[in-house]
């Protein structure tokens, strides 16, 4: 998609499935100089993590999670573009799939994004901040979220932005 062809890719965290630790290093065969088992660390062979990762992959394949994400991603993008961004021209959107960020860095109040997360919590939505100076409101719902719950969360996010923008005026 971005035209990047890496020599090395490091994957970790949720790749283990069900919250168990697991990390992988993928190396382009053209530069791989290790023999199997030669490149390892002090925490190797966590069989429980391998089993959990396998179960997670099987779940994703059986439940067509990638297809679900492709169906829900436009819902999120369109909602934010049509319902949230028009609230204020200083809001900027970036993201892909079900990982989105609403950049609030153009607001003079450098705590604006933090206020949005607090208001979202009042609307029963837990969201986090990201980006430089925590100026980006991060939306990252579960990949398996149902559409009704997703839309409910998006409406809560919009309400949080509306509340914070009213307080500015």
Regions found by a protein language model. Give the residues of each.
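Conserved N-terminal phosphate-binding loop of PLP-dependent enzymes in the Aspartate aminotransferase
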Residues: 1-169
């Amino acid at each position: 998609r971005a035209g990047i062809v890496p020599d090395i890719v490091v994957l970790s965290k949720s790749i283990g499935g069900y919250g168990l630790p697991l990390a992988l290093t993928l190396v382009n065969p053209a530069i791989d100089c290790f023999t199997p088992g030669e490149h390892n660390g002090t925490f190797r062979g966590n069989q429980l993590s391998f089993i959990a990762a396998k179960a997670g992959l099987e779940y994703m394949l059986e439940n067509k999670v990638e297809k679900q994400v492709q169906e829900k991603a436009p819902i999120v993008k369109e909602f934010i573009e049509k319902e949230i961004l028009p609230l204020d021209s200083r809001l900027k959107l970036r993201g892909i799939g079900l990982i989105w960020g609403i950049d609030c860095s153009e607001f003079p109040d450098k705590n604006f994004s933090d206020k949005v997360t607090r208001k979202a919590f009042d609307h029963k939505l837990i969201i986090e901040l990201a980006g430089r100076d925590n100026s980006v409101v991060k939306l990252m719902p579960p990949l398996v979220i149902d559409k009704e719950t997703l839309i409910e969360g998006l409406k809560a996010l919009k309400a949080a932005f509306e509340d914070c923008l009213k307080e500015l005026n």
